[in-house]
Amino acid sequence: MIRLEHVSKTFATKNGDVHAVRDVTLQIAEGEIFGIIGFSGAGKSTLVRCINLLERPQSGKVIVDGKDLLALDAAQLRETRKKIGMIFQHFNLMRSRTVAQNVAFPLHKSGLSKAQIKEKVSSLLALVGLSDKADVYP
């Protein structure tokens, strides 16, 4: 579960402050899949970066699985981030790897066994309707 309470993020620029995220409150239940859409420069990427604290909001609360991320120390935050997935706006697929191999790549550092990685990749591809593309190159 992800819950944001009155999250705001402002950037200071030479032309004044830019309010990238202003007083956002939302809740995403476990198992739900959300997309954030909007015009270029609307704050979509900044909002997502606030969820995993790649950007630290100036105000509000960021709660993931019942943990207030802003209250965690650096080590606790690193451990928590291992359980948070994010798809970047401009992501790069490795053309020399299949779709399944691209999905599996970050899992090799997670400590999972090969069998667990294969199972996880299979379930993730099924979740987004790409099981039939597992062995296709991008």
What feature does the model see in each segment?
Residues 15-18, 69-85, 114:
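ABC ATPase NBD coupling module
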Residues 37-39:
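The feature captures the beta-strand-to-loop junction immediately N-terminal to the Walker
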Residues 52:
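Helix-to-loop junction immediately C-terminal to a conserved catalytic motif
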Residues 96-105:
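Short coil-to-helix segment of the ABC ATPase nucleotide-binding domain corresponding to the Q-loop/switch region
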